[in-house]
């Protein structure tokens, strides 16, 4: 069960969570917790998906931010992947697809047939996931 309750109380000094409940002084603390947990999850999935690639691609740095028109960006020159923080609202498979998509740009620089073949090696359901992310 992934649901939890948030309890705001001015008497609390630090955030605490147990038994599917988050106890916090204010919503700012809750936002910080969500950001911290998002960073952990995204980095963990980046490491996992990076290891799927047999090619010698560089391990990129990770930036997470809210983007209005993209789910991810690959900057090959800076060896950086930027992920949209809103991906945390989607199933893990969607996050993995976006990471695989961006890592595939280290192998193929465009959206050629070879690029999509690369993506499909690691994310066979990518077409369905793309549909989910467009809705």
Protein language model annotation of sequence segments:
Residues 102:
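Walker B catalytic acidic pair
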Residues 1-97, 106-135:
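Active-site-proximal or metal-binding-adjacent scaffold patches in catalytic folds
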